[in-house]
């Protein structure tokens, strides 16, 4: 119970939610369901005008990141910082994670700074988080994204061995805790691709090709095609270095 509600609410508050004595906010119930490995899109909840404003700004920030509109994104973050409550750790975590993503586009943070900021963000809701014990915790979708970002930050710094270990541990967590949930379906292909890429960059071509194939299969199985071409590219490159040139040409 402590792991489920850590950084989200107190244990006694969770009990009140369970007994119907208190109604949770939408972002809190989403986070709790995600940590339990349950779908977060099968219920209805009333939201306040403040919650609607926060959600709208979060969507705009995500859009700015996708469109690489860095300055607009930081302007939206400033607006969000003015209305979010200090004890809303979930939104505070989103803000810090978004700063790292947007800041990565214009290189305003070094790799070390990015790693420090990402670890700080995840410890807002998981105070005892350790990279070598990833499988010991329960994660929300945003927390899984943070772990994924930390792995990418290590890869960008050139430490692909460390990155591969992070992706491996996150992959084990997803497979064990979230076998068929929507949350898992969204994360699985992405983590498999990043894991395969780190193995490829570590010159572990046989393992990299195998993981890339798993990523390709996950994309097709769950209908998430954003990294399908990237998985094919990694598989092709690994095949090339393994001397399988005909297979490599076919993948490309």
Label each region the model flagged.
Residues 52, 91, 135-142, 180-187, ...:
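Structural signature of alpha-solenoid helical repeat junctions
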Residues 67, 106-108, 157, 195, ...:
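Structural motif corresponding to the intra-repeat A-B loop/turn of tetratricopeptide repeats
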Residues 55, 59-62, 91-102, 142, ...:
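"A position-specific structural signal for the A-helix of alpha-solenoid helical repeats
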Residues 77-85, 119-132, 168-179, 212-224:
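Amphipathic alpha-helical segments of tetratricopeptide repeats
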Residues 59, 63-64, 98-105, 153-156, ...:
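Residue-level signature for tetratricopeptide repeat
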Residues 27-42:
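DNA major-groove recognition helix of helix-turn-helix/homeodomain DNA-binding modules
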Residues 1-16:
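Short alpha-helical DNA-recognition segment
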């Amino acid at each position: 119970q402590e792991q489920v509600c850590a950084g989200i609410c107190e244990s006694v508050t969770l009990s009140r939610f369970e007994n119907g004595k208190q109604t949770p906010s939408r972002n809190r119930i989403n986070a709790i369901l995600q940590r339990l490995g349950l779908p977060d899109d099968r219920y209805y909840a009333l939201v306040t005008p403040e919650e609607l404003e926060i959600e709208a700004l979060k969507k705009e920030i995500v859009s700015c990141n996708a469109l690489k509109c860095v300055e607009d994104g930081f302007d939206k973050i400033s607006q969000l910082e003015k209305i979010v409550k200090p004890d809303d750790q979930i939104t505070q975590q989103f803000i810090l994670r978004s700063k790292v993503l947007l800041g990565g586009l214009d290189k305003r943070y070094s790799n070390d700074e990015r790693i420090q900021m990402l670890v700080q963000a995840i410890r807002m809701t998981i105070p005892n988080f350790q990279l070598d014990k990833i499988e010991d915790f329960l994660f929300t979708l945003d927390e899984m994204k943070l772990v994924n970002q930390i792995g990418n930050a290590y890869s960008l710094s050139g430490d692909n061995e460390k990155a591969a270990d992070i992706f491996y541990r996150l992959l084990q967590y997803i497979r064990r805790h979230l076998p068929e949930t929507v949350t898992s379906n969204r994360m699985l292909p992405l983590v498999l691709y990043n894991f395969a890429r780190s193995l490829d960059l570590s010159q572990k071509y046989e393992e990299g090709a195998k993981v890339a194939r798993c990523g390709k299969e996950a994309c097709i199985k769950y209908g998430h095609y954003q990294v399908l071409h990237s998985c094919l590219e990694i598989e092709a490159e690994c095949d090339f270095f393994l001397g399988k040139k005909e297979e490599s040409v076919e993948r490309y």
